[in-house]
UniProtKB/Swiss-Prot annotation:
Protein name (Swiss-Prot/TrEMBL): Small ribosomal subunit protein uS3
Signal peptide per UniProt: none
Taxonomic lineage from the root: Archaea, Methanobacteriati, Methanobacteriota, Stenosarchaea group, Halobacteria
Free-text function comment from the UniProt entry: Binds the lower part of the 30S subunit head.
Region (Disordered): 222-302
Length: 302
């Protein structure tokens, strides 16, 4: 759980630092940042359209920003590196801020959206998308989209290749969210392919002779490995067969129980035979007594 909380705190701190730079460097054309923890301190790379305004006269502004980072976000010795954005129209964050400012100045949203996305495509972008959400016109909020070219919405390319930028336009009716996505000109997409018209077929087709030689080498290597394995198996000492002639046979518990049951049955059988023999003797004695009584009665009658 501690690791999860640490990741959440790091993400929250990153978002807060990004918002801080967006507010402080709005006039300088803030184009995003990158954080990299190092043993010497936190390394921060700032991208701006006007690096001179970020640094300030004699480095006054950059020292002020460094002090605020240490006090507000508890960063130890932050090292700030300011880089100039070569093509502002291909930086999604700068484009989003520009579009938000145009909406605040009263530009109609369709004109602002089409003009902005046309400038992006003219700069060489492979694709772009602008999404305006909020009270664009009227009292009801809605979403307006402007698309050009090719854009990725999910998967690893959407995270690694597509440049994202967000801005907010504060209007009289309410706020309008601005979301910009741009695919730069030199992006390598996973589904790209190239057709070579003047390609030499011999360079692309595998030579059968070379393929056969490679296959023979592979088979020879497998045969050599098999021979080595057989040699190792032959070199191992043979285990002596176990001699069970002199060993005593140990009866299991089940065998002992079976013998005990047989003995018990035999004893019960003997007891039953004794009981039946006693009954036979008693019956014989009783029969003899009856015969004697009958003889006595016959004698008395005569």
């Amino acid at each position: 759980m501690a690791d999860e909380l640490e990741f959440i705190e790091q993400g929250l701190q990153r978002s807060q630092i990004d918002e801080f730079f967006a507010e402080e460097l709005a006039r300088a054309g803030y184009g995003g940042m990158e954080l990299a923890p190092t043993p010497m301190g936190m390394q921060i790379v700032l991208k701006a359209e006007k690096p001179g305004m970020v640094i300030g006269k004699g480095g006054k502004n950059i020292r002020k920003i460094t002090t605020q980072l240490e006090e507000r976000f508890d960063l130890e010795d932050p090292q700030i590196d300011v880089q100039e954005v070569e093509e502002p129209d291909l930086n999604a964050q700068i484009v989003a801020d520009r579009l938000a400012n145009a909406l605040e100045r009263g530009w109609y949203f369709r004109k602002a959206g089409h003009t902005t996305i046309d400038r992006i495509m003219e700069s060489g972008a492979l694709g772009a998308e602008i999404v305006l959400s909020g009270k664009v016109t009227g009292n009801r909020g809605r979403v307006e989209k402007f698309n050009r070219g090719y854009i990725k919405h999910n998967g690893e390319p959407a995270e690694e290749i597509v440049d994202h930028g967000k801005g907010v336009a504060v209007m009289k009716l309410g706020t309008i969210g601005v979301n910009v996505k741009i695919i730069p000109p030199n992006a390598e997409l996973p589904d790209d392919f190239e057709i070579q018209e003047d390609a030499d077929i011999e360079d692309l087709v595998v030579d059968e002779a070379e393929a056969g030689e490679d296959l023979e080498e592979l088979l020879e290597g497998e045969d050599a490995d098999a021979e080595d394995a057989d040699a190792d198996a032959a070199a191992e000492p043979e285990s002596e067969p176990a001699d069970f002639e002199d060993e005593e046979v140990i009866e299991t518990d089940d065998d002992v129980e079976e013998e005990l049951d047989e003995l018990a049955d035999a004893v019960e059988g003997e007891d039953e035979d004794d009981e039946f023999s006693d009954v036979d003797d008693e019956a014989a004695d009783t029969a003899e007594d009856l015969l004697d009584e009958m003889d006595d009665e016959d004698g008395g009658a005569e």
